[in-house]
Amino acid sequence: MSLQLPSRLPLRLPQSRNGRIALALSVVYLVWGSTYLAVHVALGSFPPLLMSGLRNLFAGIGLFVFAARRDPVWPSAAEIRNAGLVGTMLVGLSSGMLAYGMRTVGTGTAAVMVATVPLFATVIAAVAGRKIGRGEWFAVGLGLVGIAILSHGGGATGSASGSLAILCGALFWAGGAHLAGRLKLPSDLFLSTSLQIGLGGAMSTVVAWVSGERMAEVHFLPVLAFLYLMLIGTMAAYVAYGYLIRHTSPIIASSCMYVNPVVAVALGALLLGEPVTSSTVIATVVILASVGLSFWFDYRRRGMA
């Protein structure tokens, strides 16, 4: 399925498939890497789970309105159910567990832990019956080494229960990505994405409200950060991620989880004055090398299929 935008928008996407994949990867790498900083600011007025739920719920509604105006092929009941299931995994459970864990785990440490998603994606692919080559296992292992270096260099702290919750969130994300690549979802990318994040966000919002989460005093910068998370970090990035899920392997689509911590650390250094140690530099090289290897081995596997 080709990704099309209304002709009235002054935006031209790359014409080649590889160009669109590169654009989508750039979005999920840079935007999701910046969301940790935005979350840090938004928490000044929003409690974690309510922020996650509202951000996805509103983004889902906005994207649904946009998709509906394009006169898409409307989904069947089964496709809506599948979109809700994937959204529950990617948004409701994954983001919910991340929000729960971040009550006791720092933002930088959380970003590093979320980078375990490709490991879970590889394990899930193996359990599902795909033969995983030694090269792919090596690439994942190398990425985890880089994550460990980055975590050590950043002085990671947090409770064991919070860390476990975040790792469970990473597992749910990998599971959702796996399901998204195998279930029949709405054919229109925008409509499919809107249903996934909207339904997942609705679930998170209900859970947050029932658990007693309420907004604190409203301030300008937290609201601005929330709008960034909703419009860019959710609407734009999830469309890009959905495109990757449909046109690449789950492991490649999840490779952003390796790069996002590097972006988060860089933004923290530039905007928050956080120190960049030699461990951070070494980890950056190792992590990016692991991503390159993931691309290479996946390309070879697809070429020999």
Question: Can you annotate each of these PLM segments?
Answer:
Residues 2-14, 56-57, 152, 222-224, ...:
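C-terminal-most transmembrane helix of multi-pass membrane proteins
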Residues 31, 35-36, 64-110, 114, ...:
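Specific transmembrane alpha-helical segments of multi-pass solute transporters/efflux pumps
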Residues 59-63, 120-123, 127, 140, ...:
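Transmembrane alpha-helical segments that form core, pore/gating elements
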Residues 52-54, 95, 109-116, 179-202, ...:
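Helix-helix packing/entry segments at the starts of transmembrane helices
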